[in-house]
Amino acid sequence: MIRRTLSVVVTVSLAVASIALTVAQSAKTPPLLQRIDHLVYATPDLDLGISTIEKRLGVRATAGGQHPGLGTRNALAALGPTSYLEIIGPDPAQPKPAGPRRFGLDELKSPRLLTWVAKSADLDAVVTKAKAGGVALGAVLPGSRKRPDGVVLSWRYTDPNTVLADRLVPFFIDWGNSPHPSATAARGATLVELRAEHPEPERAQKMLDALGLGLRVSQGPAAALIATIDGPRGRVELR
């Protein structure tokens, strides 16, 4: 009985310590990284995208699932407790969609870090705030996909087809009661920093500031997101 009681006490103590550590780590996380739900790494072929990330980071992304009717599928690698890297590409198992696939996948020649997605628990408030700041995020839409284990994830998000500042301005997502995808994504990588470049940095920065996002934009020859990530292969910059 004493041994069993001690075992329960130790288990509870470890659980409390784990929660405390997670809270402490979250408190140390820069504000921008706390806002990031996921980064979108678009690829013309999902297997190519998965192998590219594995070579760069040393982490092999786990299968995410299909996006029914959109002609796409994804794979995921966690970047933190509630953030992840989404590798998304065409799904050959689905019929070709009536319109173009999202994120310009049909024209994409090689994998690239295309855009990012911000967390929100009140999408309507975000859209209203954005509109007041002169930023049109588009409509709030429903989304869903089925994981390989059969669990269906549902979410709401602002229109991902709305392109602002060449995709440096994110769309926003609310997972509601669905489990966060990072919970079942491949582990081993950590997002350290996200920054951006643009030929007209002031224009992009104005929109990001209107949304209260801390992403900094510097002058560059083309629009680009640059993520600094720590992984088994060391620190890398992903573009």
Regions found by a protein language model. Give the residues of each.
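Boundary at the C-terminal end of the N-terminal hydrophobic targeting segment
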Residues: 20-26
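Amphipathic alpha-helical segments
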Residues: 45-60, 129-131, 200-211
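N-terminal secretory signal peptides that target proteins for export/translocation
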Residues: 1-4
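Glycine/small-residue-rich interface belts in oligomeric ring/scaffold proteins
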Residues: 48-103
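Vicinal oxygen chelate
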Residues: 35-45, 73-80, 85-89, 99-200, ...
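Charged, alpha-helix-forming regions
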Residues: 30-31
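Bacterial N-terminal signal peptides
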Residues: 9-20
